[in-house]
Curated annotation (Swiss-Prot):
Gene source species: Pyrococcus abyssi (strain GE5 / Orsay)
UniProt-recorded name of the protein: Probable molybdenum cofactor guanylyltransferase
Annotated Mg(2+) binding sites: 92
Its EC number(s): 2.7.7.77
Homology family: Belongs to the MobA family.
Residues involved in GTP binding: 6-8, 18, 67, 92
Top-level taxonomy: Archaea, Methanobacteriati, Methanobacteriota, Thermococci, Thermococcales
Obligatory cofactor(s): Mg(2+)
Length: 191
């Protein structure tokens, strides 16, 4: 399965391109990629970039897919799925837990569903820590054409989704969902 790192955001709350911000001597996005590469189920890592940051992302030596739509995570996932089934994460998720990702991919492969998404008991989804079939791209395309850009709503509208109940999983795996939004968040990973 492809590991797709979404790297097309604008980093408004961070104040600068957070994915290029160096933490312990390397850019944030590389911390995320290294964790993803630690997954036995991931055969190839790609970066989904915006047209504006394509060149910066190409510097890391990974295949870069450009999200020309840049309408949010929905178009990033849409772009990633052009290459096949993918496990999608945000580029600002440096605490990914490879065992958890492998678990989700195994559930996805065994389920035969169009997507496998972690879900909290209150219904909140973790769509940027999920496995998607390339066939989910058709659903995304239809929603994008209608101007419906919320990835969570696209997932909820699909009838063939595997949901993983987060509360039933090891407590430590929840750290995998952590993402950096503001500079204050960096203390969690700089220790």
């Amino acid at each position: 399965m492809i590991g797709a790192v979404l790297a097309g955001g604008k980093s408004r709350r961070f104040g600068e391109d957070k994915l290029l911000f160096e933490i312990n001597g390397k850019p944030l996005v590389l911390h995320t990629i290294e964790r993803l590469e630690g997954c036995s189920s991931i055969k190839k890592v790609i970066i989904v970039a915006s047209p504006q940051n394509r060149e910066a992302m190409e510097e890391f030596g990974y295949e870069v897919v450009v999200d020309d739509l840049t309408i949010g995570p929905i178009s990033g996932v849409y772009s990633a799925l052009s290459l096949g089934d993918a496990f999608v994460v945000g580029g600002d998720m440096p605490s990914l837990i490879p065992e958890f990702i492998d678990y989700i991919i195994k559930q996805f492969n065994n389920s035969g569903k169009i997507a496998c998404v972690p879900r909290w008991s209150n219904g909140y989804l973790e769509p940027l820590h999920a496995a998607y079939s390339k066939n989910f791209r058709d659903i995304l395309e239809e929603r994008i054409e209608k101007g419906l850009y919320k990835l969570g709503d696209a997932i909820s509208s699909a009838k063939n989704v595997c949901y993983i109940k987060i509360e039933d999983l090891p407590l430590g795996w929840r750290e995998s969902f952590f993402n950096v939004n503001k500079k204050e968040d960096l203390h969690r990973i700089m220790q």
